[in-house]
């Protein structure tokens, strides 16, 4: 037996043994309750970072715990393997995307296996594998059959030099292409969408079912769905039979409309534009349509517009108001038109100030209209009194309506209902529920993604690829230049096919799917990953789902999680699933931060100095010698503050890295990397190693004493079972790994300080410590368990249950106070009642001295804690 803790040797040994034993394979015993533990699968970039290590360690602890608690556990891993980086690698290095991706997968799989994670690799999937994207394509066809997939024109980022579509991340802050440097244009292309809006109400309402999700994530999703109840109103165009439809959540402000705004893409722009304004409007539209949505709606940019020369009629007042076109109105939102009410909307207020448009206040704060008579003179008359109230900024709060005809004097709440009712009766409006959520654009004009499985036939239209012809395989004989649009569209031998329905010459769809499609159902495939006959066997998937614990970053709070919920509901409605939500509990782990240096005189936080170039004891700019400032920031290559997992493992071992990551911060908080704290965890594991190996080396044979345990034995047994209780609660309730490890440290200290190391209680403590340590530091726990003479794996042991009787102390410490000041503490029987506690307190010699000659006015007894004498 080696007296030294050598993590490198024992970790390699046990990882190999666990594979041979099949210890991590998914158990299928139906008599056990199931537990599905899942981390969000990674993109195969080729190297793990500390964020990965934290994510997968958290899930691994949970999976190991649940196995020991008697659950059959599914803990799989896969690869979110389609995406732009592989295509860029093909362009830059001449390496086929598949080669680059699979090479990275091999490398990262080895890195993950080096972490000793209890992953069932038999369930591994890669979204770029035809075995996987065959079923991605099949699911798309389910959407198509259900009427949930359709095509329409939508704007894309277009590089006019390379003649190709760009992703948003390929456009820099100046609106230029990352590769050619050309100013990016907006271009309309026919694209595929999924009707997620059909599920908007259910996606919103079912957030209430997600009691195991962080509230902030649910709020983010609710805001993204963006349900609002408002009014649909029609403004007739002067000189035309057409009407401009607007949607507003503030119909109570309609009497304050001073202009109407159309989106530049609105089909009525040509009709409302006068001849004198045509050239100005055309120029403006050209400028705006080349801007991204983010640019147009950015809060910090002034909103721009141009008058069309046309006018619309406010249906409530009969007054004509000018029609404008503005960059901040998007055709995809609402009706593509808004009513401008500058007095009661901040954005409209700034726009009106910039273009000198009227600002008419029609709502006022209740206190500001207290002196006005806003009652109609009769039931048939309107309030005629004009209320002159102005504010120096937009008044956006609810209030009392003024200068609003028959609705003057009403509260905003009452007026909204009355105005919508009036508009409905008159036929120029109605109540309307609207969502911020828009249908999901899934088309990508790129190669490295799942091909959309449809064929375009001049006779039959859109024809689904028959199931027997799936998957539509990505061709390998493709040239990657970064120019000329989608590589697939340029490969005629792949594009040109006969129509499956009529046999006429037809063409394949050349768009591939958004990679979010792949990750919207992978958790379902894990439950039946080797099924070649169907997407998954419903009985298996319904058995394992929903995922009991999902772990991933807050950056996926909206899109990935929302799309996964959407897919689950659609597949449920297609009869494949029998549950509503995919993820029972969600843990969004914090970021891993490293110490970062910057020179405040040389670009500040925009110019980081790599930490390996800095002396941490005297941080100075290596070029100028100037003092550097430091802060903790998320680890990244650009900041030069990353810590390579393999370096930490080589120096300290996997278990130390796990222990540090789990101990340093609660899982939902950001974690600051600190080498000194890593050392601290290494020292703790060394102490545990010595504690157990010394016990084994002593060769003691625990005495099988009969009768009462000694006081020291009772105290030690109390410490043991207190640790069991605390660690279990910390792991089951809120996953407070840091406090659970603190309890292990307490138990270790109690065992170190204990007398009677030949007692059965001490043996119980040693064995319990190793078992409790197993989910956190699996390798050292396994080695120590074997050294203790056990033949079976520690990870197959039953998780210990605490004995409530062991937690009850024979004696407790009673604090005695006089007038609230502590004067003594004494040991008393734990079962003593109030009268007995007061008696013991009065008998204390120290207290008697403080009570001598004084009148006791009151005695306060708090059972199990204190006695307080109030004296005069």
UniProtKB/Swiss-Prot annotation:
Binding site for ATP: 637
Catalytic activity: tRNA(Leu) + L-leucine + ATP = L-leucyl-tRNA(Leu) + AMP + diphosphate
UniProt keyword terms in alphabetical order: Aminoacyl-tRNA synthetase, ATP-binding, Cytoplasm, Ligase, Nucleotide-binding, Protein biosynthesis
Keyword Lipoprotein on entry: no
Signal sequence coordinates: none
Disulfide bonds, paired cysteine numbers: none
Positions occupied by motif 'HIGH' region: 42-52
Domain of life: Bacteria
Record-listed E.C. numbers: 6.1.1.4
Gene3D superfamilies according to UniProt: HUPs, Isoleucyl-tRNA Synthetase, Domain 1
Any one biological process term the GO annotation gives: leucyl-tRNA aminoacylation
Pfam family, one: tRNA-synt_1_2
GO cellular component: cytosol
GO MF, one annotated term: leucine-tRNA ligase activity
Enzyme class: ligase
UniProt family annotation: Belongs to the class-I aminoacyl-tRNA synthetase family.
Official protein name in the record: Leucine--tRNA ligase
Lineage: Bacteria, Bacillati, Cyanobacteriota, Cyanophyceae, Nostocales
């Amino acid at each position: 037996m080696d007296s030294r803790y050598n993590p490198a040797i024992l970790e390699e040994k046990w990882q190999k043994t666990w594979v041979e034993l099949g210890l991590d394979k998914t158990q299928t015993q139906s008599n056990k309750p199931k537990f599905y533990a899942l981390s969000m699968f990674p993109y195969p970039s080729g190297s793990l970072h500390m964020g990965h290590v934290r994510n997968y360690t958290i899930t691994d602890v949970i999976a190991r715990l649940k196995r020991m608690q008697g659950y059959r556990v599914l803990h799989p891993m896969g690869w979110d393997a389609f995406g732009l980086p592989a295509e860029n690698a093909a362009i830059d290095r001449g390496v086929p995307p598949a080669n680059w991706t699979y090479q990275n997968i091999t490398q990262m799989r080895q890195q993950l296996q080096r972490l000793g994670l209890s992953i069932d690799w038999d369930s591994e999937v890669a979204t770029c594998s035809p075995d996987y994207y065959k079923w991605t394509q099949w699911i798309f066809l389910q959407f198509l059959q259900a009427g949930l997939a359709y095509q329409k024109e939508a704007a894309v980022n277009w590089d006019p030099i390379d003649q190709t579509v760009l992703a948003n991340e390929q456009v820099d802050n100046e609106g230029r292409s990352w590769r050619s440097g050309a100013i990016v244009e907006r271009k309309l292309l026919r694209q595929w969408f999924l009707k997620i809006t059909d599920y908007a109400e259910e996606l919103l309402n079912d957030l209430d079912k997600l009691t195991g999700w962080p509230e902030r994530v649910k709020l983010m999703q609710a805001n993204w769905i963006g349900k609002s109840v408002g009014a649909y109103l029609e403004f007739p165009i002067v000189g035309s039979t057409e009407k401009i439809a607007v949607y507003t959540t503030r119909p109570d402000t309609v009497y304050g409309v001073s202009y109407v705004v159309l989106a530049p893409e609105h089909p009525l722009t040509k009709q409302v534009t006068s001849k004198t304004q045509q050239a100005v409007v055309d120029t403006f539209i050209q400028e705006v349509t080349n801007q991204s949505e983010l640019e147009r709606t950015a809060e910090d940019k002034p909103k721009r517009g141009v008058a069309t020369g046309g006018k619309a009629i406010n249906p409530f007042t009969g007054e004509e108001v000018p029609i404008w076109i503005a960059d901040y109105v998007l055709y995809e939102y609402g009706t593509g038109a808004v009513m401008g009410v500058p007095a009661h909307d901040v954005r409209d207020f700034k726009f009106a100030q910039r273009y000198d448009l009227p600002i008419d206040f029609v709502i006022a704060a209740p206190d500001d209209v207290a002196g006005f008579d806003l009652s109609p003179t009769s039931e048939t008359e309107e309030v005629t009194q004009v209320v002159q109230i102005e504010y120096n900024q937009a008044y956006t709060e609810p209030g009392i309506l003024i200068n609003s005809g028959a609705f003057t004097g009403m509260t905003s709440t009452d007026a909204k209902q009355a105005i919508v009712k009036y508009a409905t009766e008159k036929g120029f409006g109605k109540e309307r529920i609207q969502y911020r959520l828009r249908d999901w654009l899934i088309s990508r004009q790129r190669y490295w993604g799942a091909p959309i499985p449809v064929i375009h036939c001049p006779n039959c239209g859109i024809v689904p690829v028959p199931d027997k012809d799936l998957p539509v395989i990505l061709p390998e004989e493709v040239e990657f230049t970064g120019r000329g649009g989608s590589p697939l569209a340029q490969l005629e031998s792949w594009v040109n096919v006969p129509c499956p329905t009529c046999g006429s010459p037809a063409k394949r769809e050349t768009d591939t799917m958004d990679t979010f499609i792949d990750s919207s159902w992978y958790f379902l495939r894990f439950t039946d990953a080797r099924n070649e006959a169907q997407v998954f066997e419903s009985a298996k998937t319904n058995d394992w789902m929903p995922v009991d614990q999902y772990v991933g970053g807050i950056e996926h709070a909206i899109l990935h999680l929302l799309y996964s919920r959407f897919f689950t509901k659609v597949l449920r409605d297609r009869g494949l699933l029998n549950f509503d939500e995919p993820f029972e509990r969600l843990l969004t782990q914090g970021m891993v931060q490293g110490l970062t240096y910057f020179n405040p005189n040389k670009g500040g936080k925009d110019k980081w100095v790599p930490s390996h170039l800095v002396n941490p004891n005297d941080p100075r700019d290596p070029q100028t010698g100037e003092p550097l400032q430091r802060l903790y920031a998320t680890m990244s290559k650009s900041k030069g503050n990353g810590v390579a997992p393999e370096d930490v493992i080589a120096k300290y071992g996997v278990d130390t890295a796990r222990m540090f990551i789990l101990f340093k911060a609660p899982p939902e908080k950001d974690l600051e990397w600190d080498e000194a704290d890593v050392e601290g965890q290494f020292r703790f594991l060394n102490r545990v190693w010595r504690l157990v190996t010394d016990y084994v080396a002593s060769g003691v044979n625990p005495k099988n004493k009969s009768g009462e345990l000694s006081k020291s034995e009772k105290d030690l047994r109390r410490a043991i079972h207190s640790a069991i209780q605390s660690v279990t609660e910390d792991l089951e309730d809120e996953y407070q790994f840091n406090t659970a490890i603190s309890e292990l440290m307490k138990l270790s200290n109690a065992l170190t300080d204990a007398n009677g190391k030949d007692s059965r209680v001490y043996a119980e403590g040693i064995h319990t410590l190793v078992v409790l340590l197993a989910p956190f530091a699996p390798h050292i726990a396994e080695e120590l368990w074997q050294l203790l003479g056990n033949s079976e794996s520690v990870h197959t042991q039953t998780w210990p249950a605490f004995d409530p009787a062991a937690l009850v102390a024979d004696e407790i410490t009673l604090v005695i106070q006089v007038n609230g000041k502590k004067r003594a503490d004494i040991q008393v029987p734990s079962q003593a009642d109030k009268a007995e506690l007061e008696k013991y307190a009065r008998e204390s010699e120290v207290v008697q001295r403080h009570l001598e000659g004084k009148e006791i006015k009151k005695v306060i007894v708090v059972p199990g804690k204190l006695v307080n004498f109030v004296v005069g």
